[in-house]
Amino acid sequence: MNLINNANKKLFEKINNLKNYSCQVKFSDAIEIEINDFDDNIIDLAKDLKPWRKGPFKLNATLIDSEWQSFIKFNGLKPFLNLKDKIVADVGCNNGYYMFKMLELEPKSIVGFDPSVLSFLQFSFINHFVKSNIKFELLGVQDLPNYNIKFDTILCLGVLYHRSDPIKTLKELKSSLNKGGEVFIDTMFIQRDDEFVLSPKSTYSKIPNIYFIPSIKALRNWCERAKFKTFDILSIKNTDFNEQRKTQWIYGESLENFLDPNDPKLTIEGYPAPKRVYVRLS
C-alpha cells in the first residue's frame, strides 16, 4: 500500500507493531475501549494521529475529544437504520466512527470508503483494539460503481457539497445499490422555498472545496435526476458549537472561527450559516 510519505509509513508501522492487547469495547456516545496492560505509548500514538475530526473515542481514562460530537448525528439517524444482515457502505467514512457504531445494529458486513490516508491510519489504530471485520477502502464515491459488490444501505454523510458534480455523485450512489436498497445523506442546505443553489465564490465557512449548497427543493430535483424514487426528509438542524468545536485533539480553527463574530447566522464570508438536512433516498 502506498501511504504517500515517510511520516505516514512510520505511523502505519507503529500501528502494526502494537501488541495484541486484550480489550473490552463499549459502544456508548464515545467508542469506549478498556485496554488491559495499557501503556502511555498508546496515547502517544493517538496524539501523533491528530487531528481527530470524528469521534469521540475513549481509551481507558483518556478521551480523544474529537472536533465533531459525532454521536449527535448518529443518534439522530439510528432510529431509521435497519441494518440487521445488510451489506452496508459508509462513503466518506473518515476514521470509521459511524461504522464502529453500526456494529451494534448487526449488519452482515460494512465497507468504508475514504481516500484520506490519515483517516485510514486512525481507523487502523482504533480497529486494532476493536478487532472488527470492517473493511476500509482508500477510495472515493466515484469508485463505487466499479466496486466488486453492491450495497443494501449506503451512508453518505457530509460529502455532497464537497463534490463539483453532485448529480453525478448521486447517480454513483444510486448505481451502487442492490434492489430495494437505500441511501442516507446529510448535506448543508439553504433555507429558501424556491429551486435555488448557492455556489460560493471561493470559500464557505473558510472551506475552499464546497461547491454547491442547494435549497431542499433543488436537492430533491437533483435526487430525481439521479433516478431516486423516494425522498424522505428525516430531520433538519443547525450546526452548533456543541456539535462542532475546537479541542486539544485538532489543529487550527473550528466552527466558532467560521462564522461572523457579530452575527452567528452568517458565515465569515456573509453567507447563511450552515444548516443540515438528513434525507433517506431509495
From Swiss-Prot:
User: Which Pfam families does the record associate with it?
Assistant: Methyltransf_9
In this chain, carboxy-S-adenosyl-L-methionine is annotated as bound at K54, W68, K73, G92, D114, P115, S116, Y161, R276
EC category: transferase
Q: Name one GO biological process term.
A: tRNA wobble uridine modification
The answer to whether keyword Cytoplasm applies is no
Q: Which InterPro entries match?
A: CmoB (IPR010017), Mo5U34_MeTrfas-like (IPR027555), SAM-dependent_MTases_sf (IPR029063)
List S-S links within the chain: none
- This protein's record includes keyword Transferase: yes
**One function term, GO molecular function aspect:** transferase activity, transferring alkyl or aryl (other than methyl) groups
**What is the annotated quaternary arrangement, including any partners?**
Homotetramer.
Per its record, how is this protein called by name? tRNA U34 carboxymethyltransferase
Lineage, top ranks: Bacteria, Pseudomonadati, Campylobacterota, Epsilonproteobacteria, Campylobacterales
The encoding gene: cmoB
